Amino acid sequence: MNTSDRIKSTQIALDRDLREQALLLLKEVRAVDGVDALSEQFVRGLAEPGLGHSHLIVTLNDKLVGLAATDEETTELAVHPAHRRQGIGKALIDATPTSSIWAHGNTAGAQALASTLRMKKTRELLVMEISDRALDDSAAYKDPDGITHSSLANAPVEKSVAEAKWLQSNNEAFDWHPEQGGWTTHRLAQAQKADWYKDSDVLFLWDGEEIVGFHWVKQHSPELQEIYVVGLSSAYRGRGLGDPLVRLGLHHMRAHGARKVILYVEAGNTPAVAAYEKLGFTVAESHVVYEK
């Protein structure tokens, strides 16, 4: 039987046994590649049918060895390390309905497959990190003149008002971004359901009762934390407030035990990359979108 004939379409979120196999596959892939094959949203899609993700799977002897997860725009895939170079990745890419394929970590194997299929790199997302002395130095924070700070948990306005202002600030900051821009109240509410989410980890700079910017923190563990999203409202750009906004989050994370902080940034966002490098961040990983 050809590999393409082994591909089945399913929704893993509706099959508990298959979901457990998928999570095991992802664990085995990470152990070899050193990077997660699926992003957080697609991992959630393995358990939450409401996200509407569809899946293509390849099994051998009743064992899941290949998986492609797809939403309306992109696909992410994982192939078991012991079953690579057998045409599974190619078959999954050929069968997926989207043209955009994420290669997390952009491993040598992913690059070789993309080259074989003559796929073109159209987007690159960098993972940057900071730790130890550099983190301590960059975690120094002081409110700019006329500016105060809070978290969502102790905002100076009603929580619903703060959330509406946060949403507006986000959409102003990311009107160009394919995933982070154009958020709705429903999309924000869904994001707040993540098991790691805390109101106290959503930080704001305030000019009176107006949000200057926000810094959303994700705590993977006390030692490893993340600048999940950071953005300035349009009215406050170009006023030197981006640096204290980042430092506010770093100060918060360091105070909660962080020894390493990571972030994701578009490689093409040269000013942001340069600003993070100035703070002491270095590039740790590269994630790439290939178009077929």
UniProtKB/Swiss-Prot annotation:
UniProt binding sites for 1D-myo-inositol 2-(L-cysteinylamino)-2-deoxy-alpha-D-glucopyranoside: 40, 179, 218, 226, 264
Listed InterPro entries: Acyl_CoA_acyltransferase, GNAT_dom, MshD_Acetyltransferase, Mycothiol_AcTrfase
Gene Ontology biological process terms, A to Z: mycothiol biosynthetic process
Keyword Repressor: no
Domain of life: Bacteria
Keywords, sorted A to Z: Acyltransferase, Repeat, Transferase
MF annotations from Gene Ontology: mycothiol synthase activity; protein-N-terminal-alanine acetyltransferase activity
Residues reported in the UniProt entry to bind acetyl-CoA 1: 77-79
Transmembrane segments: none
Catalytic activity: 1D-myo-inositol 2-(L-cysteinylamino)-2-deoxy-alpha-D-glucopyranoside + acetyl-CoA = mycothiol + CoA + H(+)
Binding site residues for acetyl-CoA 2: 230-232, 237-243
Span of domain N-acetyltransferase: 13-168, 159-292
Enzyme Commission designation: 2.3.1.189
Complexes and interactors: Monomer.
Family label: Belongs to the acetyltransferase family. MshD subfamily.
Role of this protein: Catalyzes the transfer of acetyl from acetyl-CoA to desacetylmycothiol (Cys-GlcN-Ins) to form mycothiol.
Protein's recorded name: Mycothiol acetyltransferase
Species whose genome carries this gene: Corynebacterium glutamicum (strain ATCC 13032 / DSM 20300 / JCM 1318 / BCRC 11384 / CCUG 27702 / LMG 3730 / NBRC 12168 / NCIMB 10025 / NRRL B-2784 / 534)
